Amino acid sequence: MRSPRGGAAAQPSGRRGDTTAAAAGDLVTTQVSLGGFDAGVAAGDLADFLEHEVGLVWRCRVKTSWTPPDSYPDFALPTAPASASAAAAPPRYDRVPPHAFVHFARPEGARRAADLAGETRLILRGKPLRVASAPDSSLRVSRRSSIAPFRFPDVRLEVGALPSPGAFLAAWRGPDAGLDLSVDPFDGCCRLVFTRDTAFTFPGFREVAAIRCDVKLEFPVRDVLEVRLYRLDCSLLLRLAAAPLVHYRTADDDFHEPVPFDLLDDDDPWIRTTDITPSGAIGRCGVYRISFSARFWPKMDRALDYMRERRVAIVDCGGGWGPRRGLTVRDELEFGEPMQDVFFCLQHAEGLKFPLLFMVNALVHKGIINQHQLTPEFFSLLGRSEENVNVAALRDFWGDKFPVFDACGRLKKALNRVARNPKLLCSKVGDDHAEVRRLVITPTRAYCLPPEVERSNRVLRHYHEVADRFLRVTFMDEGMQVLNNNVLNSFTAPIVKDLMSNFFQQKTTVYKRVRMLLTEGFHMCGRKYSFLAFSSNQLRDKSAWFFAEDRKTTVEAIRKWMGRFTSKNVAKHAARMGQCFSSTYATVTMRPDEVDESFDDVVHNEYIFSDGIGKITPDLALEVAERLQLTDNPPSAYQIRFAGFKGVIAVWQGHGDGTRLFLRPSMRKFESNHLVLEVVSWTKFQPGFLNRQIIILLSSLNVPDSIFWQMQETMLSNLNNILSDRDVAFEVLTTSCADDGNTAALMLSAGFEPRTEPHLKAMLLAIRSAQLQDLLEKARIFVPKGRWLMGCLDELGVLEQGQCFIRATVPSLNSYFVKHGSRFSSTDKNTEVILGTVVIAKNPCLHPGDVRILEAVDVPELHHLVDCLVFPQKGERPHANEASGSDLDGDLYFVTWDEKLIPPGKKSWNPMDYSPPEAKQLPRQVSQHDIIDFFLKNMISENLGRICNAHVVHADLSEYGAMDEKCIHLAELAATAVDFPKTGKLAIMPPHLKPKVYPDFMGKEDGQSYKSEKILGRLYRSIQEASNGDVVSQEVCTPNDLPYDIDLEVPGASDFLASAWQCKCSYDAQLSALLSQYRVRTEAELVTGHITFLVKNSSKKQGDIKDRLKTAYSALRKEFKSTFESIASDQCEIGDDEKNLLYEMKASAWYQVTYHPKWVEKSRGILGPDGEEIPASLSFAWIPVDYLARIKLRCHGKVRVEGQKPVERLAAYISERI
């Protein structure tokens, strides 16, 4: 019987233990691997021996091959027959010692084999056997026993594209026989597995070794977009969202498998590789045609039912039950020809410049069109219009969700749409923002991503004339998943390491591909791109900047302009260069005599208490606030970049000598002549939320679980009442949403009702949905008496050790009306000085000592520092350093003064020692080669996420929580991993700390999960139940349903209707483009920034994508707010009251063209790119929400001041002044 080669398979079990008990310590395995026997031992003989000595054997596989050291598989090369491999092999090809993978019927067999081998009592033909136990697998075995895969042997596979609905162009075919398909509900994956001879190349040798290998193509069922059935042909067409994962492992195996059922896969690792087809078909083609024997239709129908349950679209294209829609199958013209590019890319097209070529490639890479549709007619259409029109049309095209078969017809529609909406043309981006192109590179392919507007940086601002030559490249796994080190490292079975005295870690062909791209660069769209640099955040995301040189600007010239980097530690050198790529706002250009670059640091006990913080005078701080348009509420501190300095500058009075900026030596990172003060972030109201790490630590420090439960229940109750209770909705918006909820909060204050106002209702639902999702995935529980605050220093030295100062903003919307005239110009800050015991923490926080308990005191001299956590400069050690080893260069701290969250005893645990290891210095200057090696070293070793996840698991399994020895060890490893970008010291997690199973709240596959009985598990399941079947469906409002509020009509508005309609058409077109580009489901999610689901397109971190989306929408809203506020030159001198009336007329006009039935009917003529009716877009009307609030309140009459609720206070404030 042939063994299943595809991995996770079924296995019966004698008993099923309780999974929770198993997770807590009763983990077992039925697998072992053995070595030490002679090369002539057959699998059957070994199985017989083990059954006699140990116990019943269900499978035994003897293996005598492996991936030779220093070799790489090359699937494009021809091979000799496998029997000739030894003769053809280079001299360095040594065979691996024979070893075997054995499955016993019961766990006792595996344990007995390990015990006998450990006592040297398991002896075969005079040789003592060595035994290595496989990973604990009781949960997987238990789950596997009841879930069998749907297995289809000897299928035929073709990979290709659909140039039209009834035609399939094949780019590659699998072997004629021996290819198996499995659809496995066990782990939700589909696998295609076959065996082939494979050439392995060796550095310095022309000869190759031919080794027989199993090859596996694997993809999750969730990546199947559609299945088309052709019953008469006995075939399926699978359209995939992403390329499959490609694996191989050597297959010179001898099997003994007497049982008739499937088993779990052996502990013989599969090795990831790149595209195995010469033509790059796996990377560039997304359609898989699978043909099989007609006798398998009943089983196939059951497999398709399972896929249907997983929300895969199944389309029956005819057969015995209906008219046949046949499929024409033929080979593509270049069938089998080697692909010239490292990833498929259109390098040149007559008459097309780079911006257009890039967008055409983006369409092909996304699968909207395929390369066969790039016809002369298609390019001719692009040649007839201006470049900016074509780019806008292709961007509109890129927003499509489904493949397009008539590419020319769709392009014509897009060009017409742009012609009707000139605002879709790419407008000039402001100095603080830049359009950045991205390229995502996976093991088999690449994706060009359209330019996105994001915050600019020092380098892009200086080189703005060649800004389109910068490219952000991100290395990811297929399906936009994180590229973890399992993809880059070639692993062998643990028994092989035991048997080999000179074993060393190998790299995969994926690593080889990444290294080649970094060192040699690549060609794309007619340009040669070379590696430039990366920031610290990019390093963690496996991302870097590349640049396409021209005759004037080179990579070396850019590096020289950036500054003088003298550090001989590679990690620090790379981090300093990356500092220039921090996203910043350029503000004031300083004169050298205004800057003190040697302001003394505060140092005690060898600790720098002022590490990363300086001072800014009030007048300069106000100048910066003006540049950032923050004068309504000027910040107390800014996180900055200036020349070669980085850190925070807090507002303090100057010394009267003309110096306005005070920078400390601890802030200096490199030498630079750049004199623009650049701002990264600033202090502001940021609501406080718990997360899993903080909850684990507080729970371990004896904060009762009932506290977290009650806080979540309160939050859940508020979210459930958000539509029915105005007071609750207002509280949620103003206290937990920062600025994101301002529009909705103003609407509530003015008297608009969620029941009758669809845009308000949609925004509230979006916020509810996003906060529920955060509760489920992150345990992100709102803390009313909490904030995230920027760390600062008490420059006066009045705070004592153990003390801090906090003056926190209390949310208020009054400042929204400061532009409405002198009656609204009160800028008194609504703040609260916190007194008493507080808890602080900084992420990541894993050690019990990372939670610091301090005493907040009132110091009048510090009252100017708002939304800051002010630390003392006294004591044995900085409190910032005690909290996760942080400093004052911009770190944000979670702070709560809720007594229920303060651990009993009110004393901190001893903090961990965060002293960094000694930095390794090179004996020479750091080279570009060193920096690339460092980037690669991080890619194959970066495991902060794994360490943090392992900490969560062990804290959940242990009765001691975060106090468990394993957790303390993991906390130490995490500190090393966090500092890797600065020190270059790796954090290596030992095997015994790697989790075998995960608590259910971590959302792993069922076979890897157990039911957690600790607080995080209970919180998780509570939210699961609350949101089960919960339709957060953002009910899309159609034009037929749209209510019209006659209260918002004012005399004189008709004069502005025509211009309002033009603005609305332009706004809606740009809004629709944003929704399409980011695949955001609803307008309400976009405008509130509370987005429940985002398709990954360049980063594992959804937060990063959300930030870019917020930036893009903020720029759009700002543009139209500016349009609204622009008035004729002859009206500039009118008084506040007249100006406000004028704005109320315009606001009424903007409302009417959005909601009035006449204009709604007119909007019906505007269709989407595929002719579909676009849902009513309502956010345009509420850009001037402050003026619509005035109109509404005037209709209501004056609001009573006495006894008012929070939601009514703003209404009273406004009505008193109008």
UniProtKB/Swiss-Prot annotation:
Entry's family note: Belongs to the RdRP family.
Catalytic reaction(s) noted: RNA(n) + a ribonucleoside 5'-triphosphate = RNA(n+1) + diphosphate
GO MF: RNA binding; RNA-directed RNA polymerase activity
Protein's UniProt keywords contain Secreted: no
Gene source species: Oryza sativa subsp. japonica (Rice)
EC number of this enzyme: 2.7.7.48
Domain of life, source organism: Eukaryota
Consequence of gene disruption: Lack of the shoot apical meristem (SAM) in the embryo, but formation of radicle and scutellum. In weak alleles, formation of an incomplete SAM and abnormal leaves production.
GO cellular component: cytoplasmic ribonucleoprotein granule; nuclear RNA-directed RNA polymerase complex
Gene: SHL2
Biological process according to GO: gynoecium development; leaf development; maintenance of shoot apical meristem identity; recognition of pollen; regulatory ncRNA-mediated post-transcriptional gene silencing; RNAi-mediated antiviral immune response; siRNA processing; siRNA-mediated gene silencing by inhibition of translation
Keywords for the protein's UniProt record, in alphabetical order: Nucleotidyltransferase, RNA-binding, RNA-directed RNA polymerase, RNA-mediated gene silencing, Transferase
Function description: Involved in the RNA silencing pathway. Probably required for the generation of small interfering RNAs (siRNAs). Regulates shoot apical meristem (SAM) initiation and maintenance and leaf polarization through the trans-acting siRNAS (ta-siRNAs) pathway which probably modulates the expression of the ARF2, ARF3, ARF4, ARF14 and ARF15 genes.
PANTHER family cross-referenced by the UniProt entry: RNA-DEPENDENT RNA POLYMERASE, RNA-DEPENDENT RNA POLYMERASE 6
UniProt name for this protein: Probable RNA-dependent RNA polymerase SHL2
